[in-house]
Amino acid sequence: MLHRHGSKQKNFENIAGKVVHDLAGLQLLSNDVQKSAVQSGHQGSNNMRDTSSQGMANKYSVPKKGLPADLSYQLIHNELTLDGNPHLNLASFVNTFTTDQARKLIDENLTKNLADNDEYPQLIELTQRCISMLAQLWHANPDEEPIGCATTGSSEAIMLGGLAMKKRWEHRMKNAGKDASKPNIIMSSACQVALEKFTRYFEVECRLVPVSHRSHHMLDPESLWDYVDENTIGCFVILGTTYTGHLENVEKVADVLSQIEAKHPDWSNTDIPIHADGASGGFIIPFGFEKEHMKAYGMERWGFNHPRVVSMNTSGHKFGLTTPGLGWVLWRDESLLADELRFKLKYLGGVEETFGLNFSRPGFQVVHQYFNFVSLGHSGYRTQFQNSLFVARAFSFELLNSSKLPGCFEIVSSIHESIENDSAPKSVKDYWEHPQAYKPGVPLVAFKLSKKFHEEYPEVPQAILSSLLRGRGWIIPNYPLPKATDGSDEKEVLRVVFRSEMKLDLAQLLIVDIESILTKLIHSYEKVCHHIELASEQTPERKSSFIYEMLLALASPQDDIPTPDEIEKKNKLKETTTRNYRGTC
């Protein structure tokens, strides 16, 4: 994120400092801060923006004299409590849970530099082990030698994968004596922004393929005919879109690429490669779904077991379950990584071969990743992901079968649907007993208010549901679907990511809050409509009272707002049961 040092920061006025300076005799702040502020006032400075004379620093300037470490900690700690609860941040794919043992390892290795392979050889060895483990998880060919590296996340990994494809394309075109100045790359409009960043930063034409409702808001392989040409350096295929969690089909994309190339025997650029973006799916697929499950879904070959997949990335800090700041990128064979992209350094005492966009960086995330592999093993990861998938499917089931709000929700994601007939089961238990019968994907639920709901309550915006849930602590994004050919991108969805810490009890609480808030909105809508009908009969006082009561009701912790009919019945009951017992004077 970019930050500017603008007028707000340059002209920052320390209100608290001014108040304490003027009212030095009053205890307005904690003891240490109060003492610091009063002492600064005795130094004779009249300029409250002069941070060099203040014990309480301007927030945007380095103070001349610092505060005690304990006090500094408390001030910053208190300020950061304003952030949301990470566990209730259901917008994020990034892991927020860490075991005590992992924290201990992190603390012990907090200052190790991953770039310093001579000083920390065992840290480099753990990185090597992780690369080997991932290569096997992604079905590397025993006859090939995969090569890879740790990155700061999938964003950097995507850049490296794209660069490698670009270099190979340039070599092919130049060896054929053809122009190599207009490379392009293919991806669906459901791509994450990092994929588009690659094209802009490294001067590659971005060919975004619009999606549709029919394609489940992911890449339709048949659309590639309109986008692929001899200058196509490769195709990004997303194993788990951030919008809806769908897995784009590597096999079908590869088949269409073969058909296109067969129609153009004159091309010098053949065997157009695929980079599999497994930011989420890179861990979910190998641990969460058996080979036969993926085969039944038509995606038996999704990794290095398909010859067109030359590289793949994943995020360790997502479903690899590490702390933030770790990604991985691998190439199926060393020959796919051009020599000019590699650097051999003798900078820190040893010889190191690197390919990356950064140098010095923490190494503790790699330690955390290796710890997870060792402590969880295949069975531990599988159990966590199966649990997350079950909770996500159960959440979808409850929305679709809500007794309180029947027919008010539509599910846009697909993991709750049967592979055989795209339907949901009659019982939620079927998700637990027969998970292999349902579509693979990332454990998330993308849903929206139904067409039926919008027809009945057209003025109720879906975005307000997201805002009101925030008041309960839940962070759930409301966003438009990706660019589409059928206008479906004009629709918005709410998305809930089911990370490992999102257990069934929390999901049930979320369902209750969604139903409660939406019921309140419906009753508010009905009350407003009733009020409008009677607007000509309303006094100014009654109109004011109505607005106050409506806003108060929305802020109320009570589940329901009474409907106009309920209010009328209540008033009539009050009239018939109220007696005046006041006697004559």
Swiss-Prot record:
One of its GO terms (molecular function) is glutamate decarboxylase activity. Transmembrane segments: none annotated. It is an enzyme of class 4 (lyase). Its cofactor is pyridoxal 5'-phosphate. The lineage of its organism: Eukaryota, Fungi, Dikarya, Ascomycota, Saccharomycotina. Residues 35-60 are annotated as: Disordered. This is Glutamate decarboxylase. Keywords: Decarboxylase, Lyase, Pyridoxal phosphate. Present with 1200 molecules/cell in log phase SD medium. Residues 35-56 have a biased composition (Polar residues). Pfam families: Pyridoxal_deC (PF00282). It catalyses: L-glutamate + H(+) = 4-aminobutanoate + CO2. GO terms for biological process: cellular response to oxidative stress; glutamate catabolic process. Belongs to the group II decarboxylase family. Its EC number is 4.1.1.15. GO terms for cellular component: cytoplasm; cytosol. The modification N6-(pyridoxal phosphate)lysine is found at residue 318. It comes from Saccharomyces cerevisiae (strain ATCC 204508 / S288c) (Baker's yeast).
